[in-house]
């Protein structure tokens, strides 16, 4: 039903499907919202390795230790997002643990842009930022290796001096269903319903009721995009 919602929402907006397609998208996402899933109280708990079969997850790609050890392939591609493996000793000597500055199996090839990190940190109340990325301006920075920004949401586990990329990867979460519901209702002109569903997600993130209040269709769509990003 999540995929069905996305398809009919896309059909309505891009292929001229109109309200008929929106109606199908609406009934599809409503079925998801009534299926017994529940948002976890804390965003970080969604990605906890000890809590991967939780009530918020609709569909995930599961990984376990040693499931795939081929360099450069899933799930090992997460190593590209972490600190260079060659810096592990230097980081430890500087007093940083594997949890604070996780290192991968080779160089850090993927670095989130400063603009994206700034976007995620626009509101200091957003509890998702530190769970998703880390930005460093610490003493371990050198001219040779600049570890400034890294994605840490799927860093896996660390044991016996080895990092295993065993974090499950969510394809669909309940929070996304609420955002799809908000997008569908906004497209149908149901402003109150759109804001209600949008603010369910925002409430957990910012700890504020009715975080979004702007009622124009464009403003709501832009808010939905911000929450997705």
Role assignments for model-derived ranges:
Residues 90-133:
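A short, charged
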Residues 1-75, 121-229:
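Acidic/polar-rich alpha-helix caps and helix-coil junctions
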Residues 52, 82-86, 101, 114, ...:
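Short linear sequence elements within intrinsically disordered, low-complexity coil regions
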Residues 66-96:
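Acidic-aromatic pocket-rim loops
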Residues 6, 88, 105, 112-115, ...:
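Acidic, low-complexity intrinsically disordered regions
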């Amino acid at each position: 039903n999540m995929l069905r919602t996305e398809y009919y929402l896309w059909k309505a907006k891009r292929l001229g499907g109109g309200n008929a397609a929106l109606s199908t998208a609406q009934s599809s996402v409503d079925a998801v919202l009534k299926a017994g899933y529940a948002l976890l109280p804390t965003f970080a708990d969604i990605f906890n390795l000890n809590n991967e079969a939780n009530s918020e997850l609709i569909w995930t790609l599961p990984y376990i230790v040693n499931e795939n050890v081929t360099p450069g392939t899933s799930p090992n591609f997460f190593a590209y997002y972490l600190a260079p493996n060659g810096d592990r000793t230097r980081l430890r000597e500087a007093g940083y643990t594997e949890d604070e500055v996780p290192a991968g199996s080779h160089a850090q090839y993927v670095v989130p842009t400063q603009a994206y990190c700034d976007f995620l940190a626009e509101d200091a109340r957003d509890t998702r930022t530190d769970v998703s990325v880390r930005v460093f301006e610490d003493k371990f920075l050198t001219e040779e290796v600049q570890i400034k920004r890294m994605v840490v949401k799927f860093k896996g586990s660390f044991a016996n001096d080895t990092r295993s990329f065993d974090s499950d990867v969510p394809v669909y979460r309940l929070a996304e269903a609420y955002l799809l519901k908000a997008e569908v209702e906004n497209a149908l002109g149901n402003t109150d319903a759109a804001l209600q569903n949008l603010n369910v997600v925002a409430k957990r993130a910012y700890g504020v009721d009715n975080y979004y209040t702007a009622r124009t269709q464009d403003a709501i769509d832009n808010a939905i995009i911000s929450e997705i990003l």
